[in-house]
Amino acid sequence: MQKVRVHEIALELGIKSKEIIDKAKDLDLDLKTASSALPQEEAAELVNYILTGKSSRLKPAAPAAPMPKEEEISPAPQEESQMEPKEEPQKEVKESVKEAPESLPESPKEEAFEAEIPKESVKVTPKTLEQEPPKEELVSIEPSLESASETLSDSNPLPQEKTETKETIVATTLATQTDAEIQESEEKKETLAQATVQKRVGLRIVKKRSEEPAPKADRPSLEEARTPSRTAGLKTLQSLLGESDESEAALARKKKKEKKKPLPAPTKKNEQKIDLLGDRALETVSSFDDEQEEIVLFDLTIRDDINKEDEVAKKVDTDRIKVQRKTPFLDQGIRRVKRRKRRPQTVADKESISGTIEIPEEIRAYEFAEKTGKSIGEVIKVLFNLGLMITKNDFLDRDSIEILAEELELDVVIKNTSEALEYTSEEEEDEDEEGLEERPPVVTIMGHVDHGKTSLLDKIRNTKVAAGEAGGITQHIGAYTVEKDGKKISFIDTPGHEAFTEMRARGAEVTDIVIIVIAADDGVKQQTIEALNHAKAANVPIIIALNKVDKPDANPDKVKAEAADLGYSPLEWGGEYEFVHISAKTGEGIDHLLETILVQSELLELKANPEKAAKAVVIESSLEKGKGPVATVIVQSGTLKVGDSIVADTAYGRVRALIDDCGKNIQSIGPSEVAVVTGLSETPMAGAVLVSVENDSIAREYAEKRALYLRQKELSRSTKVSFDELSAMVAEGQLKSLPVIIKADTQGSLEAIRGSLEKLRNEEVKINIIHAGVGGITESDVVLAGASDNSVILGFNVRPTGSVKNRAKELGVEVKTYSIIYALLDDVRAVLGGMMSPVLEEENTGQAEVRETFTIAKVGTIAGCLVTDGSIQRGIKVRLIRNGVVVFTGNIASLKRFKDDAREVSKGYECGIMLEGFNDVQVGDVFETYKEVEKARKL
């Protein structure tokens, strides 16, 4: 049976565990501590006894029925004489402690005393007990008596003695009751009711139990009350208290204190002392009614009221917080939307909505709803029906806006909103013809990898850049300025590797003339075609340089034929493209190439205004130690000076230094000139437009606006999904992924690596790029990689420091560094291949022909075979082939040579074979054994 602990009962009733233990002793329940347990039935009986004072387990105190023995009470006069001096100073204490303790234990115990008193006195008892025992003669004795008995019970005294004392007092009370005392007891009943109510659930106890010193002072009175007979006891009490002036003074003080006693203020919100009985007369109230009151009158209503007050207070606090702390998050809440919906539409609004509405090209769904006067629900519903799932904060593209306008029957005009974010728009005004000056041409060298682009530029500049390139291939855009016949030419060298498509496209965009380098001994290759397409898309003049003509196997005519097939015919063949024969090794044709460039630039009439605010294009950017973010730029118009405030996409700052291609510090650069800029807040994206503005605050404002816009756009893109894309996204989540962190030396290289890695995927594996950045490998990168399972850090032209290596070793993170991009891609491709599930390939091990069959009862069919090829092994996989058709595929259950089990039988020997779960073997069948071999797949 489940048991209940004392502290649980105390918690339920709102009283102390100690009081419950005291009450349990009246029912002969042996409870010692708050952790003591008792069965549920006894617990229910105990709770009922505490609340009502009634119990079927309450036994009459048998030893207390006869009168006390003479020898037990004989010490009373002695104790009285010894302790009498202490009675006077304790009177005030007794009266102050009187109220609550006096009445708490009375009502339950009186039930027991009714059974103990002889029948002749029972006639008087009910009336008396209903109206409470306190009397005029017992004003100073009874509280002390109660305190003493409680103290004795706490210290485990003899229960016999306490019961006898109680009975003696009750008997004395019956004998001395007067009409005045009855009236006094009615006043006292109110105190009893209050004390009883205080013990209910949810009500606090106003006063504690009697203090410790009080019982000591009360002992003389207690012993005096123990007289040999009732008559003697009556005389003793009368002699002590009846004619005493002090007792009358104490009674007067007690009455005065009862009238003036204020209700103590509640210390907790859920506790309140209430006067349940008021000033009602109690003569007509029966004991049963009082007990009903005790059971029914809980303070639930008061607690409810308190809870309501708390809720109101909380609501007030919340409202105050909303007013005081106004944040953009609160503006996006439900309340704001509701207020907007309730706002009545003015006549002006209706007129504007009915006409043509200007809608920005980049607009969120809820903003579209506001501008068109439609609800956001209508907008989302239309797009939902068309298979596009969006939220109210998602951006709408041009197609979605047009569809919505058609579906909702609106006349809208889409305008380009990015003008507000375009810091370059102010610079793109019509240039004043008077301020224009001739500028040098910007020439981009493009072509296939290893066709000699950088070597050609080295020969023009008389440097050795190519020799310093890792693997002999260019992996960054390089910008240089050379002088020919007093005229400057700016060259941009682009990588030829397939991974650097973006760089080549960027180089073609900012250029005036493109030189396509083709090796005369190799011909037109994939990247050559791509470079030609980039140049054609940029609508710039193309000069084709046939390099390596000094080689013995060079065939320029073959290259011209291949170019003509692509639509690039040479001038001598009636085409429009200049083909120049050069050799980067010997210098042959270099001057002719430069002259061709200058002639072409004169035809283009390249001009710019150097007095305007500078506008440049970021060719490459990187993070350099000691300099911070740096960007290689080529100026398109105006003049960029040291100290100018600049902004490039989300990066901003002030030009701290300008470094030319020779490494010298310069003060300014004009149109078509190249330099490295330092002083930016972050590395700008390659291809970003850099402009100079009036001051730093304007630059900062442009950059922050654009950063916020791009972030919102990215978040919006991540939430939008169509039904068709949904299944693809689910499948994407089930792919195995290799988490990588990429760190590169320049922004262009980073883009190239990122783009190449994202292409390395199939239906089973993919690359998950956790983080990609420009700069060295740091400890934070290692910690980030450590937080992801099986993450790898890939460094390109960067190296980790000693502390970073140690940290990576601690966290078990693999750091790989490369200087050649195709080595990086090959390694990643190999890792992805290992992640893919292996391919199972079959390898034939042997063949046997059935010559005879034997059927054995309870065993099966055994085939007598001759091994014709390889060897037959026990337990290996086997196919049964009959007339060229596979009849059964399974395992060999038993392999025997004559009567002995064999592990393997080689070619030319006979053996007996039994198949696992197949007996339909016929003469002439062929057994073909094989094993499955796992082989790693390649991406």
Swiss-Prot record:
Any one GO cellular component localisation term in the record: cytosol
Polar residues bias (residue ranges): 146-158, 170-180
Sequence ranges of Basic residues compositional bias: 252-262
Chain positions covered by the region annotation G5: 583-585
Pfam families associated with the record: EF-G_D2 (PF22042), GTP_EFTU (PF00009), GTP_EFTU_D2 (PF03144), IF-2 (PF11987), IF2_N (PF04760)
Residues covered by the tr-type G domain: 438-607
Protein location: Cytoplasm
Superkingdom in the source lineage: Bacteria
Annotated positions binding GTP: 447-454, 493-497, 547-550
Record keywords, A-Z: Cytoplasm, GTP-binding, Initiation factor, Nucleotide-binding, Protein biosynthesis
Region of interest (G1), ranges: 447-454
G4: annotated segments: 547-550
G3: annotated segments: 493-496
Annotated region (Disordered), positions in chain: 57-274
InterPro entries in the record: EF-G-like_DII, EFTu-like_2, IF2_II, IF2_N, P-loop_NTPase, Small_GTP-bd, T_Tr_GTP-bd_dom, TF_IF2_bacterial-like
Task of the protein: One of the essential components for the initiation of protein synthesis. Protects formylmethionyl-tRNA from spontaneous hydrolysis and promotes its binding to the 30S ribosomal subunits. Also involved in the hydrolysis of GTP during the formation of the 70S ribosomal complex.
Family affiliation: Belongs to the TRAFAC class translation factor GTPase superfamily. Classic translation factor GTPase family. IF-2 subfamily.
Name the UniProt record assigns to this protein: Translation initiation factor IF-2
Natural source organism: Wolinella succinogenes (strain ATCC 29543 / DSM 1740 / CCUG 13145 / JCM 31913 / LMG 7466 / NCTC 11488 / FDC 602W) (Vibrio succinogenes)
